From Swiss-Prot:
Gene: PIK3R5
Phosphoserine: residues carrying this PTM: S458, S507
Biased composition (Acidic residues): 318-335
Region (Disordered): 315-339, 389-416, 454-510, 565-601
Positions of modified residues (N-acetylmethionine): M1
GO cellular component, one term: centriolar satellite
Disease note: Ataxia-oculomotor apraxia 3: An autosomal recessive disease characterized by cerebellar ataxia, oculomotor apraxia, areflexia and peripheral neuropathy.
Protein name as catalogued: Phosphoinositide 3-kinase regulatory subunit 5
Matching InterPro entries: PIK3R5/6
Transmembrane portions of the chain: none
GO molecular function: 1-phosphatidylinositol-3-kinase regulator activity; G-protein beta/gamma-subunit complex binding
Biased composition (Pro residues): 571-585
Subunit structure: Heterodimer of a catalytic subunit (PIK3CG/p120) and a regulatory (PIK3R5a/p101) subunit. Interacts with beta-gamma G protein dimers.
Domain notes from UniProt: The heterodimerization region allows the binding to the catalytic subunit.
Length: 880
């Protein structure tokens, strides 16, 4: 073959890669069609998985394309290429000993550390991932599967649970079938151990591992024997990942695994003289739970504690008291031997990839442009100029003791084996780091009791008047929930003798060993409003009494779907008292210019389109699923390799594969601003509600209520805005500016409808400094009254960008309000509506609460609080 020539297989893989990247550049929005593009990534994975040798071909082409991106400065393509590289390495069966592909990849991605965030952060994570794979081949696959299957080991005890929340009334039956298939137990512990051991030995020994023979011998082992072999193998991999030199780590791991194999009784199938054939070992299906969800709360997630209590029992996921005792002992040792700690703090170990396949936060830089093999093996731990990028890695996952330093392990023989390595690694921490941790413990030890959600402040009240907190936000339309208090074990519900720790809801410093709870929600903008209200309630409850956040860090995933047309009036529970009639379907609310022409059968998906504008890879692989019919997404994908090894292949629909891809590789959240509205009813009662996408007021809300009544809507009749009875409203709004200043306006309008929507439909609205709502006014210019006919309105529409607004009915004129296109959140007889950004619940009873200066007006207090945002996981986060 001539130099530069390619084979047919290479051409096919290159063509599939080009299809994956098509339309992701800056000109992607000019593409008028997008149906089928979401299958390109899945098709590429299917093509490559047919032969183990295809993975190396794809990796070479990804690196070549990445170098072109670096030369041309094509920012939009870096994140998809990095994710493709990560997922491909994760599934690669084995890297030959003479392959320098990972070294070239480290050299390539090292050049992107000077790019802006998030591109430099993504490359930092890739460098850490590559470093771990160089030292312990296949360790990232092992961690991911261990976490998803609930198989913790002593030194790495994290777990990942995936929960699918669907409303059967909202989604098609095909989606429900796929969700139920995912939640069906597919892998027994015996099968999971077998898969992990096959992968570990093949990743280390390559073609010299007789995979079919090893599979037969593992099948003959009992579950207890497999667990012992797996524990030794996994601990050896974790130890190898902490060795400084990659070549030495691989040699030690190979020797250790060979000894484990001989001890287990199958030496003939490991390190055979005659090389055999590599086998593709797919990632097993993650543990999933599927629930029917149509509430404004996440109370149903407490059932996960009941299902996972074996993994959550004290001493399995970690004993806080023992860890604190160890930290105190380490602090004492450092105080008596400060110079030793200062010297040892220069020795840092590389960080490990996160258990849920999210790339762990780490970086590495080289002192020169050319990266030799020797420099690459220690680019995370040994290069001092890694500090230039502002990166310091301090991961307790990298606490594995070096194999040749065993004398230190025997000094603390009374401790658990998994704690020996943590004990040694903590000696390497600097005194300043321990002081910071001690200070954080003192803050966490304070009471987390929270006050009810409060308003951002009255819009038109004088500054010298105190702002009274509104009544507690009410949960609306929550279905009856089982009382889990009698089912959960006592160690979960017993009052703690000291304040309980909880995981931060959103933090870059989360414990990488913490268990993860993935919450995947399906639906339209109506469902996104329910998620926002449930998230707000969850924060308030967890601030008062941590339960879920004591054991899990929460990740929220949003899968948009078109609302099902087969909604029946009897499918929805009865509405709250303010709702006029039983709701069924949520029609799509037309814009003011489309009133009377657009059908109401569907709700919008603006939130998902907003996420797609922020993250093109989310738009391609998640939002694009809406453009395909369910029968295509539910086709089965059969992997022949799994059939050859397991005997019972796991056939997953395309939709299931894409959902698992989204959950495993979407690691960066996009923060969606949550809004609150304080409503005053004609009786004087007040209530505070949460919304995230839209608030409809007046005729549009009343029409939605009539449409939701089902067959009764024909009897009531539906008029458009031209026939609606006008409302005289006083509208006071604050128009924000880039400088942060606000300009207030006060006007009186005669309107039929006033709608507030999140400004998220245009590319120019993505600037985070200009977070705003779009105020849509349907104003009556002139009303024509006739004795023989109905009154007829001449209307005009206008739009205003606002950040706060107050709407008051003149002479206490009542109107209806609908939140997030939700028929269950239609409130009648409202005379006053105040809308403002929502703030996080306050924490009371802090050890030293900050005192407000007497000269500071009460109106300014909300500025000291953080805005409440709903974190939705995406692949790249918000791109600059």
């Amino acid at each position: 073959m001539q130099p530069g020539a390619t084979t047919c297989t290479e051409d096919r893989i290159q063509h599939a890669l080009e299809r994956c990247l098509h339309g992701l550049s800056l000109s992607r929005r000019s593409t008028s069609w997008s149906a089928g593009l979401c299958l390109n990534c899945w098709s590429l994975q299917e093509l490559v998985s047919r032969d183990p040798g295809h993975f190396l071909i794809l990796l070479e082409q990804i690196l070549q394309k990445t170098r072109e991106v670096q030369e041309k400065g094509t920012y939009d393509l870096l994140t998809p290429l990095a994710l493709l590289f990560y997922s491909t390495v994760l599934c690669t069966p084995h890297f030959p000993p003479d392959s320098d592909l990972l070294l070239k990849a480290a050299s390539t991605y090292h050049r992107f550390l000077t790019w802006p965030v998030p591109y430099c952060s993504i490359c930092q994570e890739l460098l850490t991932f590559i470093d771990a794979e160089l030292k312990a081949p296949g360790i990232s696959y092992q961690r991911l599967v261990r976490a998803e299957q609930g198989l913790p080991i002593r030194s790495h005890r994290s777990s990942t649970v995936t929960v699918l929340l669907l409303n059967p009334v909202e989604v098609q039956a095909e989606f429900l079938a796929v969700a139920n298939k995912l939640s069906t137990p597919g892998h027994s512990p015996h099968s999971a151990y077998t898969t992990l051991l096959l992968h570990a030995f093949q990743a280390t020994f390559g073609a010299h591992c007789d995979v079919p023979g090893l599979h037969c011998r593992l099948q003959a082992k009992t579950l207890a024997e497999l667990e012992d072999i797996f524990t030794e193998t996994a601990e050896a991999q974790e130890l190898a990942s902490g060795i400084g030199d990659a070549a030495e780590a691989r040699r030690w791991l190979r020797t250790k695994l060979q000894a484990v194999g001989e001890k287990a009784g199958f030496p003939g199938v490991l390190d055979t003289a005659k090389p055999g054939k590599l086998h593709t070992i797919p990632i097993p299906v993650a543990r999933c739970y599927t629930y029917s969800w149509s509430q404004d709360s996440f109370d149903i997630l407490q059932e996960i504690l009941l299902k996972e209590q074996e993994l959550l029992q004290p001493g399995i996921l970690g004993d806080d008291e023992e860890e604190e005792e160890e930290e105190e002992e380490v602090e004492e040792d450092l105080e008596t031997d400060g110079h030793c700690a200062e010297r040892d703090s220069l020795l840092s170990t590389s960080s490990l990839a996160s258990h849920d396949s999210t790339l762990s936060l780490a970086s590495s830089q080289a002192s020169g442009p050319a990266l030799s093999r020797h420099l690459l093996t220690s680019f995370v731990s040994g290069l001092s100029d890694g500090m230039d990028s502002g990166y310091v890695e301090d991961s307790e996952e990298s606490s594995s003791e070096w194999p040749w330093r065993r004398g230190s392990q025997e000094r603390r023989g009374h401790r658990r084996p998994g704690q020996k390595f943590i004990r040694i690694y903590k000696l390497f921490k600097s005194t300043s780091q321990l002081v910071l941790r001690r200070d954080s413990r003192s803050l966490e030890g304070s009471s987390d009791t929270a006050l009810p959600l409060r308003r951002a402040g009255s819009l038109c009240s004088p500054l010298d008047e105190p702002v009274s907190p509104p009544s507690r936000a009410q949960r609306s339309r929550s279905l009856p929930q089982p009382k889990l208090g009698t089912q959960l074990p006592s160690w979960l519900l017993a009052p703690a003798s000291r304040p309980q720790r909880r995981r931060p809801f959103l933090s870059g410093d989360e414990d990488p060993k913490a268990s993860t709870l993935r919450v995947v929600v399906f639906g339209s903008d109506r469902i996104s409003g329910k998620v926002a209200r449930a998230y707000s309630n969850l924060r308030r409850l967890e601030n008062n009494r941590p339960l879920l956040t004591r054991f899990f860090k929460l990740q929220f995933f949003y899968v948009p779907v078109k609302r099902s047309h087969g909604t029946s009036p009897g499918a929805c529970p009865p509405p709250r008292s303010q709702t006029p009639s039983p709701p069924t379907d949520s029609p799509r609310h037309a814009s003011p210019g489309e009133l009377g022409t657009t059908p109401w059968e569907e709700s919008t998906n603006d939130i998902s389109h907003y996420l797609g504008m922020l993250d093109p890879w989310y738009e391609r692989n998640v939002l694009g699923l809406m453009h395909l019919p369910p029968e295509v997404l539910c086709q089965q994908s059969l992997k022949a390799e799994a059939q050859a090894l397991e005997g019972s292949p796991t056939q997953l629909p395309i939709l299931a594969d894409m959902l698992l891809y989204y959950c495993r590789f979407a690691a960066r959240p996009v923060l969606l601003q949550v809004y609150q509205t304080e409503l005053t009813f004609i009786t004087g009662e007040k209530t505070t509600e949460i919304f995230i996408h839209s608030l409809e007021l007046g005729h549009s809300a009343a029409t939605r209520a009539i449409k939701a009544s089902g067959p009764g809507s024909k009897r009531l009749g539906i008029d458009g805005d031209r026939e609606a009875v006008p409302l005289t409203l006083q509208i006071i709004y604050s128009k924000g500016a880039i400088s942060g200043r606000s300009r207030w306006s006060n006007l009186e309008k005669v309107c039929t409808s006033v709608n507030l929507n999140k400004a998220c439909r245009k590319q120019e609205e993505l600037d985070s400094s200009m977070e705003a709502l779009t105020l849509n006014l349907t104003e009556v210019v002139k009303r024509q009254n006739s004795k023989s006919k109905k009154g007829f309105n001449q209307i005009s529409t206008s739009q205003i960008k606002v950040d706060k607004v107050q709407i008051i009915g003149s002479n206490s004129c009542p109107f209806a309000v609908c939140l997030d296109q939700d028929e269950r959140k239609i409130l009648q007889s409202v005379v006053r509506c105040e809308v403002s950004p929502c703030y996080k619940p306050e924490k009371s009873d802090l050890s030293s609460p900050p005192q407000t200066p007497p000269d500071l007006p009460a109106q300014a207090a909300p500025d000291l609080c953080s805005l409440l945002c709903l974190p939705i996981m995406t692949f790249s986060g918000a791109l600059p």
